[in-house]
Design a protein with these regions (language model features):
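Short, conserved micro-motifs composed of acidic
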Residues: 19-28, 167-184, 431, 697-728, ...
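Surface-exposed loop/turn segments and immediately adjacent short secondary-structure elements
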Residues: 9, 228, 232, 244, ...
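Catalytic palm active-site di-aspartate
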Residues: 82, 216, 455, 494-497, ...
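Active-site palm subdomain of RNA-directed nucleic acid polymerases
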Residues: 107-115, 530-545, 643-674
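Conserved pre-catalytic core of RNA-dependent polymerases
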Residues: 82, 410, 427-644
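Basic, alpha-helical interaction scaffolds
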Residues: 240-284, 309, 316, 721-794, ...
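Catalytic palm subdomain of template-directed nucleic-acid polymerases
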Residues: 88-91, 126-144, 583-600, 671-695, ...
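A shared catalytic/ligand-binding motif for oxyanion handling
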Residues: 1-342, 349, 353, 357, ...
C-alpha cells in the first residue's frame, strides 16, 4: 500500500479466522472476517490517513464486508466481495447475491461514493455493451459468459457502472487472472453510475509474490474525491509520573522540601496555586515531560536499515525475473527471497526475546495487563470518532461544530432539572467545626490509587504520597483551613469530561457516550474525608446496597434469587418490577440535596462547605478536535462524594416506601420491587412514581420491566396508563434472572460474557511466545471471574457444570494451541495452565459465600432471605434443586459441618480447594 500509495485495499480469500481489526504496520489498519473452517474470508485495509475517519464496519459474511469512511463532502462506503467459485451449490450462490443486494441497498443514497471491489466473480463481462450502455463502457476483455451476464444484470438493477470497461487499456492491463496459459478478466470494480466521473483510471498492476496470489493481479483504481485533511491535534505535554522510581521519588521529595511549600494556613487560592506550581516545577525537573503529538508506528519497531536493503534486493530480483523469464534470474530471486525471510525472522525474534523474558518475571504483572489492553484496543474497529450528529440528526464534520455539539449536549444533560414539589426545610444544625486529624488523612490517602488521569490542575495523588509524613501534615492543615473558611480553591471547580462510547447504538450519537469526569486529585482526597464523616453521622437503609460498606451486588442478587426460589418451591406467584431512574445522577436537584442534608442532621458548616464545592462548577469536554470552552454545570457529577450524596438523597425521599428486604432492593438508582400479585405491584410502582416526581426524579419507562413467575391476567401500567414491558428474563446487576427461577439462562449468559473477555485478552492468550503459566495467570485473573460472576448464588446441576467446563476447556486448549484432534488430556491442559477444574472453583465460591452469610447476625438481610419461609406446601413430584441442597452436598464433600462456620480459619482451610485468582481468594 505504501509503495503504490493506496488508501483503501480490498482483500479476498484471506482464510483468516475471526472478526476483528488489526494494526499491520505503517499505521495501516486491517478489518477482516473469517470462519473457523479457514475458508474464503474477506478484509479491507485502510491507510493511516483514513483509519481515524472510519465510522462503522459491517461484517455480513466470510464473503462480504463493508467499511464506511467520512470524507470532506460526505461518506464513502467500500464493499469487499468474494463471490462463490464455479461448482458452488446454487443455494449458496442465491444466498450470496441476496446478501450482496441487501448490502448495496442498505448503503445510504447520500453517500458520496459506493465502491464495490469483487474477486473471483468468475464472470467475463466481455466487450459487448448492447442493452447495457449505461453500466458497460464497451472496453472489456474477452467474451461475456453466463456469470458475466449475472454481473451485468446486477449492475443494471443497482445502477452500478463496471468501471474498467470505460477505460481503453492494453491487454496486459486488462488481464486480472492468468493460469495455464489462460488469461481472463474476472476481478471488477463497480461504482454508482452517477459517481463514475470520480474514477480517473482503472487497470491491473504487476504484483510481487507474497503480496498477492500468483495467478491473480491486483486491480487499482485512481479516484478523485475529497478525502479528509490531516488535522493536527494539539496535545498538551504531560509530566512522566509513570516513570517514577524509588530513586526519582527521593530526588523529587528533596527538591520539594528544599523549595518549600507555602504556609497552608494562608489565603486558600494563593496557597493552592503556589503549592501546585512548586510541585509541578519540581516534577518536571525530576521526571521530565512528554512533547505531545502523535506517536510513531510501533508495529515495525524491529525494522532497521539492513532489513530494508535485503527486502528491496528481493523485490528488484523479482522484477528482473518477470522481465527476462530466465532460469538464472529465477534462482537469484529464490535465494534472495529466502535470505530476506530469514533476516526478517531473525531480527524480529531477537527484538521480541527481551520483551517476553520481561513478561515472565513476577514484576511484569502490570505490564502484561497493559499489553493485553493495548492489543485489545488495536483490535477495535473504531477507536475515535471525528463526526457527530446534531440534535436534529444532521451529521457535523467541521471541528468547531463538533466541539460545540459536545458542549451543547453535556451542558443540557448536566443542567436540566425536572419540576418538583418543594419540601419543608429543616432547621440548620449549628455546631462547632470538627477539625481533621492526620490519621484521618492518612487513612484516606491509603485508599487513593495511583496511575489515574489527573484533573485540570495536573497534580496527582502520587505527589503527596512521595512527600510522606510531611505531605500528610501539610494537607491536614490545608484541609482544616478549607473547613474553617467553608470554601475550596477556585482551581478545584474546573474539570474535564472525556466521552467514552458505550459500545452500543449509533457511534455518532452523543447520547450513546458516557462522560468520564476528571477532577483535581487533591479535591478527591478532601471529598473522601467528607464522605467518611457523613457516613458516621447518618445511617442508610438496609434496602440500599450501592456505595455502602459490606454490601455488594452479590447481596442483592442472592436475596432476589432466594426469594424467587422459595416462591417457586411453594408454587406461589412472585412478581418483580425492575425500576430504573432516568438520568438520576445527572439530574439530581441541588436544592433538594441541601434540604436532605439538613433533614438528616448534618452540621451547617459541612452543608455550606458542600454547597461551595457544588457552586460555580465549570467543565470542558475533551474531543479528538481539542477541548471545548468552559461552561457551568449544575450537577457536580463524577466526584468521590457524589455517590453517597445520591444514595442519601434517594434514601430520604423514599424512606416511607421501604418495606425492607426482601421486598425492596436498591442498588444506587436500580431498584427491584417484589409483590404477590400484579395489582399489588402496580400500586407499589405508582406510589414510587409519585414520590419520585415530587423530588424531581423520574422513572425511565422504557427500561422499567416486569417479570412474573406465574402468568396472571392483566398488565401493569404507570400513572398515565403506559404499559410496562413484560419479560421472561432480566439482567439484574450483571446476573441474568429467569422468571421460572432456574439458572440455565444465567450460566449461558456468563459463558457469553467470558468469551467476550477472552477475545479482549487474545493479545496475550493467543500469543505463541507467551508462556502457558503466564496465560494461565491472565485467564484466572480476567476471564474466569467473568465466567463465575454470581455463581455463589447458583444451585447448579451437572448439566450446568458440564456447560461451564466445556467452555473453559475450549478456552484453555485454544490458549495452549491444541485441538481435540491432538488427543491431549484435560488434566494435562490444566496442569500446563495451572488451573483447577471449574467444578472445584464453583464449590469453593458457594461455601465461601455460605460461610460469609451464616457468620452475619440473624437480623442481617441475607440471613433473613436465606431463612425466610413462604406460606404453603411444596408441590407433588420431584422437587426442584434448591441452593441449600447444593450447599449441604458441598459440605459433605469437603468434610465440614455447620458447627465449623464460626471458626473462620478452619472453614477457610477446609473449603479452599481451588487455585487463587485474585487478592480476595488469597486472603
Amino acid at each position: 500500500m505504501k509503495r503504490r500509495r493506496i488508501d483503501v485495499l480490498c482483500l479476498q480469500e484471506t482464510r483468516w479466522m475471526g472478526c476483528k481489526a488489526k494494526e499491520i504496520g505503517e499505521r495501516i489498519k486491517l478489518f477482516y472476517y473469517g470462519v473457523e473452517t479457514k475458508t474464503n474470508g474477506v478484509a479491507i485495509a485502510v491507510a493511516g490517513t483514513l483509519k481515524e475517519h472510519v465510522l462503522s464496519v459491517n461484517r455480513v459474511s466470510e464473503r462480504l464486508i463493508s467499511v464506511r469512511i467520512a470524507t470532506n463532502e460526505g461518506f464513502w462506503t467500500v464493499i469487499s466481495v468474494y463471490a462463490p467459485q464455479c461448482g458452488c451449490p446454487e443455494a449458496d450462490e442465491m444466498a450470496f447475491y441476496d446478501e450482496l443486494d441487501e448490502a448495496i441497498k442498505s448503503t445510504p443514497e447520500s453517500d458520496y461514493l459506493l465502491l464495490l471491489v469483487t474477486r473471483d466473480f468468475n464472470g467475463h463481462v466481455g466487450q459487448d455493451r448492447k442493452g447495457f450502455e449505461r453500466v458497460h463502457g464497451g472496453r472489456g476483455f474477452g467474451i461475456r459468459n453466463q456469470d458475466g451476464e449475472r454481473i451485468v444484470d446486477m449492475a443494471e438493477a443497482q445502477d452500478l457502472a463496471i468501471a474498467s470497461t470505460f477505460f481503453m487499456k492494453r491487454k496486459s492491463q486488462k488481464v486480472t487472472y492468468c493460469s495455464g496459459g489462460q488469461k481472463s478478466e474476472i476481478d471488477h470494480i463497480l461504482v454508482r453510475r452517477n459517481d463514475l466521473k470520480t474514477i480517473k483510471d482503472v487497470k491491473d498492476v504487476k504484483s510481487i509474490p507474497g503480496e498477492v496470489a500468483g495467478q491473480h493481479r491486483p486491480v487499482v483504481a485512481d479516484m478523485c474525491i475529497a478525502l479528509p485533511k490531516k488535522t493536527k491535534t494539539n496535545v498538551e505535554p504531560r509530566i512522566r509520573w509513570w516513570k517514577m522510581t524509588k530513586e526519582s521519588q527521593k530526588i523529587l521529595r528533596e527538591k520539594i522540601v528544599e523549595t518549600g511549600l507555602p504556609d497552608p494556613s494562608g489565603p486558600i487560592d494563593s496557597v493552592w496555586a503556589s503549592a501546585a506550581n512548586i510541585t509541578l516545577k519540581c516534577a518536571r525537573d525530576t521526571l521530565g515531560e512528554t512533547v505531545g503529538g502523535r506517536r510513531g508506528d510501533m508495529a515495525a519497531w524491529f525494522w532497521n536499515e539492513n532489513l530494508q536493503q535485503v527486502v528491496k534486493a528481493k523485490k528488484n530480483a523479482y522484477k528482473i525475473w518477470q522481465d527476462t523469464k530466465s532460469l538464472a534470474a529465477l534462482n537469484d530471486y529464490k535465494s534472495k527471497k529466502k535470505a530476506a525471510k530469514a533476516a526478517v525472522a531473525k531480527a524480529k525474534n531477537a527484538a521480541l526475546d527481551e520483551i517476553y523474558k520481561k513478561l515472565d518475571t513476577s514484576q511484569a504483572e502490570k505490564f502484561v495487563f497493559l499489553l493485553a489492553k493495548a492489543r485489545h484496543r488495536n483490535s477495535l474497529d473504531v477507536t475515535e470518532v471525528r463526526t457527530v450528529k446534531s440534535g436534529n440528526g444532521i451529521v457535523l464534520k467541521d471541528p468547531t461544530e463538533v466541539k460545540e455539539r459536545w458542549k451543547q449536549y453535556f451542558s443540557h444533560l448536566l443542567n436540566q432539572e425536572f419540576p418538583r414539589k418543594e419540601r419543608i426545610s429543616a432547621r440548620p444544625v449549628v455546631g462547632p467545626v470538627q477539625p481533621r486529624s492526620v490519621e484521618e488523612v492518612r487513612k484516606v490517602m491509603k485508599k487513593m490509587k495511583i496511575g489515574k488521569a489527573v484533573g485540570p490542575d495536573g497534580v496527582p495523588v502520587e505527589a503527596w504520597k512521595v512527600l510522606g509524613e510531611s505531605g500528610l501534615l501539610w494537607l491536614t492543615t490545608f484541609f482544616n483551613n478549607i473547613t474553617r473558611s467553608e470554601r475550596i480553591p477556585d482551581a478545584w471547580r474546573d474539570s474535564v469530561i472525556v466521552p467514552v462510547f458505550k459500545r452500543k447504538g449509533d457511534i455518532m450519537d452523543c447520547a450513546n457516550y458516557r462522560g468520564i469526569k476528571l477532577t483535581a486529585h487533591t479535591m478527591k482526597v478532601y471529598e473522601r474525608l467528607l464522605d467518611s464523616r457523613l457516613r458516621d453521622m447518618v445511617e442508610i437503609a438496609a434496602d440500599q446496597f450501592g456505595f455502602t460498606p459490606e454490601r455488594s451486588t452479590i447481596d442483592a442478587i442472592f436475596i432476589a434469587r432466594q426469594v424467587m426460589e422459595k416462591y417457586r418451591e411453594k408454587n406461589k406467584p412472585c412478581h418483580i418490577a425492575f425500576l430504573d431512574l432516568e438520568k438520576a445522577y445527572d439530574k439530581l436537584p441541588r436544592t433538594l440535596l441541601w434540604e436532605v442534608l439538613r433533614e438528616r442532621g448534618i452540621p451547617e458548616y459541612m452543608v455550606r462547605t458542600i454547597q461551595d464545592m457544588y457552586g460555580g462548577s465549570t467543565t470542558r469536554v475533551r474531543t479528538v478536535h481539542g477541548t471545548t470552552s468552559k461552561f457551568e454545570i449544575g450537577v457536580h457529577q463524577g466526584s468521590a462524594l457524589s455517590p453517597f450524596l445520591f444514595i442519601l438523597t434517594l434514601d430520604t425521599v423514599v424512606k416511607n416506601l421501604m418495606e425492607g428486604p426482601p421486598f425492596t432492593l436498591l442498588y444506587a438508582d436500580d431498584g427491584a420491587l417484589i409483590a404477590n400479585s400484579k395489582v399489588e405491584l402496580q400500586d407499589k410502582i405508582r406510589e414510587w412514581q409519585m414520590t419520585l416526581a415530587d423530588a424531581e426524579l423520574r422513572l425511565n419507562l422504557k427500561k422499567t420491566e416486569i417479570m412474573s413467575s406465574i402468568e396472571e391476567p392483566g398488565d401493569v401500567s404507570d400513572i398515565s396508563g403506559t404499559m410496562f414491558t413484560q419479560t421472561k428474563e432480566f439482567q439484574y446487576l450483571g446476573s441474568l434472572l429467569s422468571a421460572d427461577g432456574t439458572v440455565g439462562a444465567a450460566v449461558r449468559g456468563r459463558i457469553t460474557c467470558a468469551w467476550l473477555k477472552w477475545r479482549e485478552s487474545t493479545g496475550i492468550l493467543c500469543d505463541r511466545r507467551c508462556s502457558r503459566v503466564l496465560k494461565g495467570k491472565v485467564y484466572r485473573t480476567i476471564v474466569r471471574p467473568a465466567l463465575l460472576y454470581g455463581s455463589e448464588c447458583w444451585p447448579v446441576s451437572k448439566t450446568h457444570e458440564r456447560m461451564l467446563n466445556t467452555a473453559e476447556m475450549r478456552m484453555l486448549r485454544w490458549a495452549c494451541g491444541f485441538t481435540r484432534c491432538d488427543r491431549v488430556r484435560n488434566e494435562d491442559i490444566r496442569t500446563m495452565m495451572q488451573t483447577v477444574p471449574i467444578q472445584l472453583k464453583l464449590l469453593e465460591q458457594r461455601l465461601r459465600w455460605y460461610g460469609h452469610v451464616m457468620r452475619r447476625p440473624s437480623h442481617h438481610l441475607t440471613r433473613r432471605a436465606l431463612e425466610m419461609e413462604v406460606p404453603g406446601k411444596r408441590s407433588r413430584g420431584a422437587p426442584k434443586k434448591r441452593w441449600t441442597d447444593a450447599i449441604y452436598k458441598d459440605m459433605k464433600e469437603v468434610g465440614v459441618t455447620t458447627d465449623d462456620i464460626q471458626d473462620r480459619a478452619l472453614w477457610r482451610s477446609r473449603t479452599r480447594t481451588a487455585d487463587p485468582a485474585n487478592m480476595r481468594d488469597k486472603r
